[in-house]
C-alpha cells in the first residue's frame, strides 16, 4: 500500500501518492531489486526532472540488493548523460548493482546514512543450454565484469587490480569503509536543513 499525501492550496485540495510528492522535490527512490520495469521508471523520472530544471540536483535514494546488470546500466548511463548532478544516498543496503549506482553519483555528492551497508561483488551468471550458447554467455559475463570493474576503478580511484581482487567475493562495507574505499564521499546522520531537498 502506497501512502497518499493531501496538499491544500488556493485552488483546493490535491492528493498525491508519496513518491509523486517526493518527485516534486527532485527525490527518486530505488527501493527494490533492479529490473527493467524499475529502470524504465527511474530513467523516465530523471529525464522528466532534467526537462523541468537542468541546473538543479536530483536525489536518488538507494535501498537495493542489486539485480539486472543491463537494467542497472540503463540507469547508470542516464545518470551520466543528463545535465543535473545526481546525488546518490544509500539507506539500508546498496549491494551489487545498487552499490555500483551509488558510486556512479556525482563526485562529492555520494552519501550513506550511518547504519547502511554497501556490498560489491562480481556479476553472477548461470549459463544453460547448448555448449555454443554457454560459450557466448561466458564471454558476455566476462565483458560485463571487466566493464563494471573499470567503471568502479574510475569512480573510486582504486587501481583496477584491487577492484578485481575485492569483487572476487561478496565484499560488505560500513559507510566509513565505503568512504575510505571511494564508493561514497560522505556519511551523514542529519540533513543540514529540514527540507526534502536539503541533502547536498
Curated annotation (Swiss-Prot):
Catalytic reaction(s) noted: Hydrolysis of proteins to small peptides in the presence of ATP and magnesium. alpha-casein is the usual test substrate. In the absence of ATP, only oligopeptides shorter than five residues are hydrolyzed (such as succinyl-Leu-Tyr-|-NHMec, and Leu-Tyr-Leu-|-Tyr-Trp, in which cleavage of the -Tyr-|-Leu- and -Tyr-|-Trp bonds also occurs)
UniProt entry keywords in alphabetical sequence: Cytoplasm, Hydrolase, Protease, Serine protease
GO biological process: protein quality control for misfolded or incompletely synthesized proteins
Coiled-coil ranges (or none): none
One example GO MF annotation: serine-type endopeptidase activity
Family per record: Belongs to the peptidase S14 family.
Protein name: ATP-dependent Clp protease proteolytic subunit 2
Organism: Synechococcus sp. (strain JA-2-3B'a(2-13)) (Cyanobacteria bacterium Yellowstone B-Prime)
GN (gene name): clpP2
Amino acid at each position: 500500500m502506497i501512502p497518499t499525501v493531501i496538499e491544500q492550496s488556493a485552488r483546493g485540495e490535491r492528493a498525491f501518492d508519496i513518491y509523486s510528492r517526493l518527485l516534486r522535490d527532485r527525490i527518486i527512490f530505488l527501493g527494490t531489486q533492479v529490473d527493467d520495469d524499475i529502470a524504465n521508471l527511474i530513467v523516465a523520472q530523471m529525464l522528466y526532472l532534467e526537462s523541468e530544471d537542468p541546473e538543479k540536483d536530483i536525489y536518488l535514494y538507494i535501498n537495493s540488493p542489486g539485480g539486472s546488470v543491463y537494467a542497472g546500466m540503463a540507469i547508470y548511463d542516464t545518470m551520466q548523460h543528463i545535465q543535473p548532478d545526481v546525488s546518490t544516498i544509500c539507506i539500508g543496503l546498496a549491494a551489487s548493482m545498487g552499490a555500483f549506482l551509488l558510486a556512479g553519483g556525482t563526485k562529492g555528492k555520494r552519501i550513506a546514512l550511518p547504519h547502511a551497508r554497501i556490498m560489491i561483488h562480481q556479476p553472477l551468471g548461470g549459463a544453460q543450454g547448448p555448449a555454443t550458447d554457454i560459450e557466448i554467455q561466458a564471454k558476455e559475463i566476462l565483458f560485463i565484469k571487466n566493464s563494471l570493474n573499470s567503471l568502479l576503478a574510475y569512480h573510486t580511484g582504486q587501481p583496477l587490480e584491487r577492484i578485481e581482487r575485492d569483487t572476487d567475493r561478496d565484499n560488505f562495507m560500513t559507510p566509513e569503509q565505503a568512504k575510505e574505499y571511494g564508493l561514497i564521499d560522505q556519511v551523514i546522520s542529519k540533513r543540514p536543513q529540514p527540507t526534502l531537498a536539503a541533502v547536498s
